[in-house]
Amino acid sequence: MAERTHACGKVTVEAVGQTVQLKGWVQKRRDLGGLIFIDLRDRTGIVQVVFNPETSKEALEVAETIRSEYVLHVEGTVVERGEGAINDNMATGRIEVQATKVNVLNAAKTTPIIIADDTDASEDVRLKYRYLDLRRPVMFNTFKMRHDVTKTIRNFLDTEEFLEVETPILTKSTPEGARDYLVPSRVHDGEFYALPQSPQLFKQLLMVGGFERYYQVARCFRDEDLRADRQPEFTQIDIEASFLTQEEILDMMERMMTKVMKDAKGVEISAPFPRMTYADAMARYGSDKPDTRFEMELTDLSEFAAGCGFKVFTSAVESGGQVKAINAKGAASKYSRKDIDALTEFVKVYGAKGLAWLKVEEDGLKGPIAKFFGEEDANVLMTTLEATAGDLLLFVADKKSVVADSLGALRLRLGKELELIDESKYNFLWVTDWPLLEYDEDADRYFAAHHPFTMPFREDVELLETAPEKARAQAYDLVLNGYELGGGSLRIYERDVQEKMFKALGFSQEEAQEQFGFLLEAFEYGTPPHGGIALGLDRLVMLLAGRTNLRDTIAFPKTASASCLLTEAPSPVAEAQLEELNLKLSLKEEK
């Protein structure tokens, strides 16, 4: 078999007159009665191959048997197309290949999905036949983008003198957040490894080990409820460094992301990135990962609501809640009563009891709650919300967390529906000064807002024992267009501070020693100050490639139920395998 001389998408007018050897898949076959045209595809693109009896009867006879997705080896001569046959939509649209020989390397059944960017296949079918789905150019281009992003990051970190170090996949189960995936040990009866949720502890131990600068393209595993932007196994760019301040880490990440955007996407972005505290983000956007590509910020009306005539507002404030509103500029005529009812049902998903609304008309406020506001109150509302005729005012009165969640989500929905979002923008943002701990009323205990190894502000360390809810974290999240790209922090590196953190989280001294004794002991051998960040590679690629589903950036992803439709994993295993592991199944009976 002759070697391939050209990739299909790279045969240009410079090759006219040359004999070329091409290999690829049949994208399309057209029989024009005596002439057969085949679009031959490989990962670089498509080239048109012509089978003409005047050139080769033998090649034409073979071409008559060829169908879509057959794998071919074609030998032929490159010729220029006639003036009326030029296709400027193709890189190879000015030439075609007159076939002199063709060899069918492999035949193909009729594929269950159309191999084209615009496929009509359902996602389940695409996942079941993922190897066919990956043939679509849009999928290849996504993974080329992923490769380019990863290569740029590796090159950047190499110039910054970081070492790429692999950390264990089989490790110890520790209570860090989500459920662990467990792996039974054959050698140690009744004991289990866990797949890592992140390399957090190992990268800190590498800092104890004096490596100073580490990174890893790390596989992580979390057994949690899945959403469109979550997978049970995912990849993060894991970075840790000793002796750097928070400012130095943020500056380095800005330089890295600027290079990624330029090299992998061809987009120039400016640094430093804007910064916003966690409290400010929640107050203004109702989200800890705000999309700043459009306005429509939340406005706090609690002070006004406390003295107004609308009892729903006043009672919310009196019970310790708040009232906030968003002004959808010029949207009054675009939302009917039925549309607003749909918005009301939408905010209820986020815990809101309802959605109050007003439309601003030339002669004042109109809507179900307009009667509760006299002229003076109406003027205050209009002024506070910067409202003018044609605006739609939307209010939620409830607990602070419910107000933030519901209005934050409503803001994003309105931004999309009103086409306020400039999709060409890439708005990076740092969200800083996070709370260190969050209180869970159901569990009646504190949980780490990020993870238990985050360093509090020095002046807040004592609050861990007196008022944990007031302690602030030296933590930072990188946000892009309303998505959390990653999170990081300075880490605790002193045993006494780490023990105070564990105590605030409800660990007894014995529990802390049992779970994290190896880390606590490591802190007694001269641990340097250190910090880092972990960036979600899958999510970053999703945003840069313009995809809407994280699964499109992972070669062989899982479904929302954490199953693989291609391999049918997870699956039962043989009884003999369980016996080797000294395991017995005790399945719950279906009710």
UniProtKB/Swiss-Prot annotation:
Protein name: Aspartate--tRNA(Asp/Asn) ligase
EC category: ligase
One protein family per Pfam: tRNA-synt_2
Main location (coarse class): cytoplasm
PANTHER family listed in its UniProt record: ASPARTATE--TRNA LIGASE, MITOCHONDRIAL, ASPARTYL/LYSYL-TRNA SYNTHETASE
Compartments where found: Cytoplasm
Catalytic activity as recorded in UniProt: tRNA(Asx) + L-aspartate + ATP = L-aspartyl-tRNA(Asx) + AMP + diphosphate
Species: Bacillus cereus (strain ATCC 10987 / NRS 248)
GO cellular component, one term: cytoplasm
The keyword Aminoacyl-tRNA synthetase belongs to this UniProt entry's keyword annotation: yes
InterPro entries: Aa-tRNA-synt_II, aa-tRNA-synth_II, aa-tRNA-synth_II/BPL/LPL, Asp-tRNA-ligase_1, Asp-tRNA-ligase_1_N, Asp/Asn-tRNA-synth_IIb, AspRS_core, GAD-like_sf
GO MF: aspartate-tRNA ligase activity; aspartate-tRNA(Asn) ligase activity; ATP binding; catalytic activity, acting on a protein; nucleic acid binding; transferase activity
Binding residues annotated for L-aspartate, in chain numbering: E176, R222, H450, R491
Keywords of the record: Aminoacyl-tRNA synthetase, ATP-binding, Cytoplasm, Ligase, Nucleotide-binding, Protein biosynthesis
Residues binding ATP: R222, D223, E224, Q231, E484, G536, L537, D538, R539
Enzyme nomenclature, EC number: 6.1.1.23
PROSITE patterns named among the record's database cross-references: AA_TRNA_LIGASE_II
